[in-house]
Amino acid sequence: MKTTLSIGVLAALCLSACASSGPITAATPGPAASAGSKVLTVFAAASLTGAFGDIGKRFESANPGVKILFNFAGSQALRTQIELGAAADVFAPANTGEVDTLVAGKLVISETARIFLTNQLVVVLPAKNSAELKSLADLSKPRLKIVLAAKEVPVGNYAAQALGKLDASLGAGFKDRVLANVVSYENDVKQVVAKVQLGEADAGIVYTSDAVAAPDLKKIEIPADSNVLARYPLAPLAQSKNPALARSFIAAVLSAEGQAILQRWGFAPIR
């Protein structure tokens, strides 16, 4: 039977963990910090690239001799890699479902997982906006080129949910008309952003954090009642070779400094 993580329990865990204040500090001494075992491998959603990169640099500075190896990709691809035996110490996908699957496979211990941030969606447009898109309703105009993430990717699934919600305000069939304009489905959110930046698409639906990381793009906001709240979980892997170091990195992400970095990159605290 598949074990499903309780959002309420995860939120409570996060609130407790996030209560810690202060900067990113040195890891607690232990086996993981001994010579020859100072490499920490973190598998994280592509949308976390910039923020985790910054947190990682600060963590390495606070812990001389420690090297963090990041693997950023679509959450479902990362989960599959872990299931196939890829070595990882920490997993941070963009939805709870990927962690649920690993809990069921005994690759993550449920009690160690926690939600540590939230994100929402926004429509991004090329800087030139040659299609002259001004509103969400314009996305249903015929012959546009729209790029989305694949439905297996969290942001692709969230985009489909948001488009469905917009049917209520923009008219039945709006979602179908928008999907008729989709010219490609990408493997992660960064690929969606790249195609819009290159002018290969008139619009794409990405996370708010990705729009913050790409200030050259124009954007159209999605109203809160039609948007989707993405909750990101964070967990050490049960087979981690560096469990103490993994816990220390997670503590760094949950620290006041770590949370401030995440918010600078456009993420929001849990709510």
Named regions from a protein language model:
Residues 14-17:
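C-terminal motif of bacterial Sec signal peptides marking the signal peptidase cleavage site
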Residues 19-62, 67, 71-72, 76, ...:
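Exported/periplasmic ABC-transporter solute-binding proteins
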